[in-house]
Amino acid sequence: MRSPVVRRTALAASAAALALFATACGGSSDEGDKGADGRTAQADKSASAAPATTKPLSAAELEKAALAQTDVKSGKVVTKLPATDDIAQDKVKTDKAACAPLGLLQVGSYAGKPAASVKRSWTGDAKKPEAGASAEDSMIAALDRAKVVLTLASYADGGAEQAMKDLTKAAADCAGGFSFTADGETTKVAKVAVTAAPQGADEALALTSTVDAEGDKFPAKSVVVRKGATLAYFPAVNMASAASGKDWAFPTEIVDAQLAKLK
């Protein structure tokens, strides 16, 4: 008979929300395998931010600006994601229309209609289990690392600001939960909470979504930041958290590294 931890891990792995794991573990890296809840003022700014007049970055410019292996001190950056892990907007459905931006965010897509976009993924380094750890504890230690899918999207005609408004409104409208379906898999989100967002962007929004996998709940996290006419999306998961249900720390250093490249 499987233990509760193993069962939780199996359930979490089958959830559509955790398609991010497949993306983060596949593809090719740039240079190989190198070794307090609360609302933020930045999130609230989205309701009144003036549209940016900045020309949207082209796909080539986004590629140059996107996170690279040399930009991070740990983990692995993947630049070539499998096509099967790049879920199109029209393949994602939510039970509530107001929650559509959150469903798209959860599966590693984007809100609105960008002029261009590029994707990356980042996987944190694996942790070593303590000496004498049980098999289950060793498994949890190996899984205790964040996996992030990064999408850079540039928008014309104030589209970046509008996308932030839509995401912020969806977070409020869908605080009580929603469900979404992607590639035939339905995922239930029990609740959505706005948390403290990273600094350094024109606007930023951070969310913790409580995923309900057949009664076993765990937190998935997302950050979206705007710099001019470009949005950077960072949906993230931690499989150890999915197995245990415990909270985990979003890797804000990835956001900082990406923001540093967006001028």
What feature does the model see in each segment?
Residues 10-11, 21-67, 94-99, 105-140:
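N-terminal low-complexity, Pro/Thr-rich disordered segments
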Residues 8-9, 222, 259:
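Hydrophobic alpha-helical segments, especially transmembrane helices
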Residues 50-84, 88-89, 209, 245-253:
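Extracytoplasmic/periplasmic mature domains of Sec-exported, cell-envelope-associated bacterial proteins
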Residues 78-218:
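A small/polar (G/S/T-enriched), proline-flanked helix-loop surface module common
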